[in-house]
Structure formats: C-alpha cells, structure tokens
C-alpha cells in the first residue's frame, strides 16, 4: 500500500497545478491536521461564548467534534450518527475562519480535486484520508527531530524549543505568502516581545471584525494612516489601537523589511537565506552566541535553508525537463520592468512548496500537549493560540467595592466641609449677600488666580444707618471734612464752631459708620501696639462744644477716609 503522506503530497501538488479552476487566489494556504484541530478548538470556544458560557473548550469535546466534523465533510457519516451540541454553529464558525484567512484544509482540497473529474489516476480515497486525519498509530511521529535514545529533561526541552522555533519561522514565511492568514499572524504578533499581548490582540481582533478586514491589514492600515495620512486622516484619540502604537509599528516595519528582501532579491537561494537570517537575528537579538535559544534558532534556520535550496533545485529540474507550450523566446524575469514586476515570484513558489510539505505532515500523537499548551511557559513572547484568542476580563464595575471603602466613603460624606471665608470688598455693604452666589466659574479659570489669604479678615456684616436729622447747611459738611483731613494746619486752624459731637457721629454716612465699627473691633488683632490717642467723651449736653486743640489733634488722627481701615487691616496680615 502506498504511504498516506505521499498521497497527500500528490493531492496538494495537483491542487497547485489546477489552482485557477479550484481556487480564487494563487497564494491560498493549506491547513494541515494540527492546524485544523487548533482552528476547531477556537471555533468551539467561540460558540460556547456566544451561548453565554466561558471561552473554553474541553479536550473531550474537541476530539468528539473533530471526528464528527471529518466524517461529515468526507460524506462518511451515517444518518443516525449523534452530533455534538451546537454542531451546526461550530462548523459554520470553523469554515468562516478558513474563508477569512484565505485558506483551505485537507478535506476541502480533496473535495475540489474530486469535482474536477481528472483523467489522472488518484488512488487516495476518502476512507484513507479519514484514517490519515483521525488514526495516527501507524505513523512513527516527528520525522525532523529524531527521538533521543536516553531520555532526559534537558533533551526533551531542546526538542520542544526547536519545534516552537520552527513554528515561528514558518508563521513568518506564511505571512509573507498570505497576508490574510490570521492564524499565522497570531503566532508571531508578539515574537519577539513587542508589548503586544492579549489586550493588543483583542483590540486588533475587534477592529478587524468591525471593519471586516484581516488582522494584518488592520495593523498595516493603522500604521500607514498615522505615518502618511496627516492630521486630517489620523485616527481619533479614542482609537483603542493607539495604546499599542509602538508595538504595532515595530511589527509592521519588520514585515516590510522581509517583503523588501523578498522583492528585491532575484536569486531565490539568496533570498531564502536572507529571509531566514533576518528572522533569526530578530529573534535572538540581545542574546549571546552561546545561549541555548540562540543555538536552537541557528539550527532551525539552517535546516529550513537546506530544505528551501532542495526545493529550488527540484523546481528548476522540472522546469527544464518538461516545457510544453512555452515559447523559446520567453523573456527573462529581469527584463520586465527592470526586474520589479516579477520580483520574488520564484521565491513565493518555493515558500508555497515548503508550506505544502508542512501541511502534509501527519497529526501529532499527543493531542493534549497540542491543545492544552502551558500559558505560563512563553518562548520569545509567544503564548498559546487559545490563550491569545480569549479576550481578557474587562472591569465592568458591577462587583461591589470592599466594605472598608464603602464605610470610609460614608463617613467622609457626613463630615462637615470647611468653607473658606470670602474676602469682601470695601463696598460689599452696598450689595446684597445673594449676589455672592452668582459668581461664575470662569471668573477664576485656575486655582492660581483664586485670591487667598493666610489670616483673612473677619466677615463684616452690613449695618444700615439712617440720619436722624438733616444737615442744616453746607458749611457744617465742609467743616467736618476739614476735621478728618490729615493735611490740616493746626496752627492756623482756629476754633471750630459750636456743634455737639453726638450729632456729628449720627450724621455720618453709612459707609463711614461701617469702617469705624471695623476699626474698633479689630484694633487689638490687626494693628501693632502703638500710642493711642485719648478720645474725650462728650457730655450729653448740647451746649458743651469740643473746641480744645488736643481734641482737634486726636480726632484728626483717629478719623480715616472711607475704606482705609479695611485696606490697612488687609495689608497688615
């Protein structure tokens, strides 16, 4: 019996030969058995999340759904075969993921080849493909890394590290061939560490679904818009991808660098060597030459380089041996648009050949190790795909805060709030207190402009004073102003007309009355100790005038102009 691996390779080769008939794109990639199983796990977890459950899928459910899916797609399932719960939604999600990634699985390849009705004989049946995908006891395991005769922990770790590094190298090459492959991008988005963890991948995934674009196209368009779009086309400040601008920029620029190597190098052998060397140096940057990871990356790069050169030799032999329907005057590649139109085309074909060989590998023996990867064990920043596609928990604020916080908040709410005394103007007695509440917020746009005082003066309550008697004539007003002036000449002043002191005090205006009260109440607090003039108490009799010189001198010192007492007490603080 023929080897199933060779039959799968022949099936894929025929698909590449007839791709214009069976596929929409030449760069359509193929999912192998392991990638099919991982994609089904993601589809099952996504359906569980849509039904109100957690984003999770048990190993038994995945394996049961896997066998059911393979049988139904190959048409080998019986009518009364029991199907898992929500099987229709799981299969729909699985096929949608393949379609958006511009990819096909092995069963899709078999179905498309079967519908062609080719005259070429194909001995590979659906039963053999079912056995190849579900029963792997007849296969000897990993052909690239032989099993060590004396098992030990260190050798097992080296084999596991090499397998992970090989997956990272192939994912970068897959992304160069098919930029729509979200499965490949998820494996290398944070390899090496770029700060693009689960949160960044979740934001990228949500934006991709909203815009109906691939993950790589979303990241590329975001970086290009910021770099080349200008202010008018720049993303909004609320864009969730702005938080990951640095990491996305590093990732996009590195892929651009790989595309430049692919397009500017005409020799496919040199291009393959440069691609693998660039990826290797990017992964081991900052590590010493004797580091185990550096040595493992070097070994994987050399192995892939040797395989690429062997594939190039096979392609060149096939081209020169069989050339039907090709004109002998066929132009060379470098003669078309100076070698830029078809630059890298030969290398793309070689990379497709390499990826097809990987897709034809038999499934892994240890399904638990494949599906249940260690979340804490990350190599070069890579995490398991299931962990990456699971959205991080969002804080919705529905859970109550701790009891101590709530008690402290209630106590702070009941505490009386201290209000700062307002410094009122000297004319505040002429306005109503209700006007103070109408102060607008933009009167003090910043805290630095708010008037402050270390020891504010006490608030003065306005007192309404009314004149008991009107002034008899204007001469009395002029005389009163002369007595309160500080520039009066005492030697030539003469005597004052007979006027009772009580009547003069009662006939002062309302503003002067308030200033005198403020001076008498705050004299001890705001004024420094000084020599105080003795104020003589006038008698109640109207016939006793204040005509002495000492009385005129003391009254001239004590009497101030309107508002002077308030300003003096304010600036003495």
Swiss-Prot record:
This protein's name: PCNA-interacting partner
Region feature Disordered, mapped onto this chain: 492-532
SUPFAM superfamilies in the cross-refs: P-loop containing nucleoside triphosphate hydrolases
UniProt cross-references to Gene3D superfamilies, sorted A to Z: PCRA, domain 4
UniProt GO MF annotations: DNA binding
Gene name, Swiss-Prot/TrEMBL: parpbp
Domain of life assignment: Eukaryota
Biased composition annotated in UniProt, kind: Polar residues: 515-527
InterPro entries the UniProt entry points to: P-loop_NTPase, PARPBP
Function: Required to suppress inappropriate homologous recombination, thereby playing a central role DNA repair and in the maintenance of genomic stability.
Keywords on record: Cytoplasm, DNA damage, DNA repair, DNA-binding, Nucleus
GO-annotated cellular components: chromatin; cytoplasm; nucleus
Coiled coil: none
Signal found in the keyword field: no
Subcellular location: Cytoplasm; Nucleus
Biological processes per GO annotation: DNA repair; negative regulation of double-strand break repair via homologous recombination
